A protein has these predicted regions:
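Long, highly hydrophobic alpha-helical transmembrane signal-anchor segments
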Residues: 2-12, 88-101
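Membrane-interface extramembranous regions at the lipid-water interface
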Residues: 2-31, 35-64, 129-153
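Charge-rich, acidic-biased intrinsically disordered regions
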Residues: 80-94, 141-151
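Hydrophobic alpha-helical transmembrane segments in multi-pass membrane proteins
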Residues: 20-38, 59-91, 102-127
């Protein structure tokens, strides 16, 4: 049996570059302010570090997309939840003791946006860990788009 060793040339990034890249990804825990960190790191490092710049820009785009997705999902959930009040309003005498079953479906469906938010955030934190390790991390959602549009890093 012949063993083939895979040769890779991995660029060693400085600790500062890795820290800035990881911070850009980890900023996802700050919520709506997350893209600001990525944009600030991108703007301050674009002349200094291609690695930190690329990771920060990618993180900012991912976080902005996440904000848009969350706005849409929470708006849809809010609309659905508001619709569950129609039976209560129309038949207030019937539902004095307990809300209709559709109300509980609306409450239970709140888990969907929470799961999406949690997974989105965990993926961002995974990106932070990979960036801290010095890996050339690419988000599955926006990684290729960012690298194609901004090929200078």
């Amino acid at each position: 049996m012949v063993e083939v060793k895979k040769m890779t040339t991995q660029v060693q990034h400085t600790q500062e570059e890795r820290l800035l890249a990881a911070l850009a990804h980890a900023a996802i825990v700050t919520g709506a302010m997350a893209p600001v960190a990525g944009i600030l790191i991108y703007l301050t490092q674009k002349e200094k570090s291609a690695y930190a710049t690329g990771q920060a820009l990618q993180a900012a785009v991912y976080q902005l997309l996440g904000l848009l997705v969350m706005i849409v999902i929470w708006s849809c959930w809010g609309g659905f939840y508001a619709l569950t009040f129609i039976p209560i309003i129309r038949n207030s005498d019937q539902y004095q003791d307990a809300p209709p079953p559709i109300f509980w479906v609306g409450m239970g469906s709140m888990i969907i946006p929470l799961i999406v938010m949690g997974l989105w955030g965990l993926y961002g934190l995974y990106g932070a860990l990979r960036a801290w390790a010095g890996a050339d991390f690419r988000y599955a959602v926006v990684g290729r788009l960012v690298t194609e549009k901004f090929t200078d890093f």
